[in-house]
């Protein structure tokens, strides 16, 4: 439920639930990330949660450049979630049919902003380490620089703190702290308590 709620802003903004032809999927989502990469959950559940068609892509094809365009067109792919490094390898024409492009996993290079924007397409920059269930915040890319990671999504909290855990002022540097419903936990309560300790200065019971 955490991941689905995290995807909601981008999905709603892209109007994926618009008119659909009877008997046809409303959208086609590329599944191009390795399942060993946590961001693959974004592709899978994005499609399943909204009745879209999930289209697996061969890993060798995703890593290539010119071969991606014809594959995306042939498979009617309209939604792509990937990392900037990969999308930078693809020719602009490869994304002609894509109306929702979600990027994350690494910094968004400024030089990609103009190249990826197109009429009828929304581009989102997302941030969230594996420890925070893939996505904790997101921002629509508008062309304004620098490219931002956005505000926390529903159920999440973000804060930038100093060395003593106190929130810093606007324009000041500090460490980004994440709190919220999707922080990881597993079979070792002691290790969980160590890695996701409380942040009393923020009033958070768990933080990363």
Task: Please report, for each region that a protein language model flagged, where it lies by residue.
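Conserved AMP-binding
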Residues: 33-37, 60, 130, 180
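His-Asp-centered acyl/peptidyl-transfer active-site segments
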Residues: 23-25, 31, 41, 94-97, ...
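Gly/Ser/Thr-rich phosphate-binding loop
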Residues: 44, 49-54, 78-81, 87-148, ...
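AMP-dependent adenylate-forming
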Residues: 122-125, 140-208
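Conserved AMP-binding/adenylation subdomain of ANL enzymes
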Residues: 3-28, 38-78, 139
């Amino acid at each position: 439920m955490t991941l689905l709620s995290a995807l909601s802003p981008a999905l709603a903004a892209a109007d994926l639930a618009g008119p659909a032809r009877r008997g046809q999927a409303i959208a086609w989502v590329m599944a191009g990330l390795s399942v060993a990469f946590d961001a693959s959950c974004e592709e899978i559940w994005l499609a399943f949660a909204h009745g879209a068609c999930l289209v697996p892509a061969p890993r060798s094809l995703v890593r290539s450049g010119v071969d991606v365009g014809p594959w995306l067109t042939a498979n009617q792919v309209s939604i792509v979630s990937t990392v900037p490094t990969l999308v930078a390898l693809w020719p602009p024409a490869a994304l002609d049919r894509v109306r929702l492009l979600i990027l994350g996993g690494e910094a968004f290079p400024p030089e990609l902003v103009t190249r990826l924007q197109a009429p009828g397409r929304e581009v989102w920059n997302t941030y969230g380490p594996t420890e925070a269930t893939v996505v904790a915040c997101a921002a629509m890319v508008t062309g304004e620089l620098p490219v931002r990671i956005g505000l926390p999504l529903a159920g999440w909290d973000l804060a930038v703190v100093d060395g003593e855990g106190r929130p810093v002022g606007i324009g000041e540097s500090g460490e980004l702290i994440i709190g919220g419903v999707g922080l990881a936990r597993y079979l070792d309560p002691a290790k969980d308590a160590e890695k996701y300790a409380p942040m009393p200065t923020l009033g958070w019971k768990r933080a990363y």
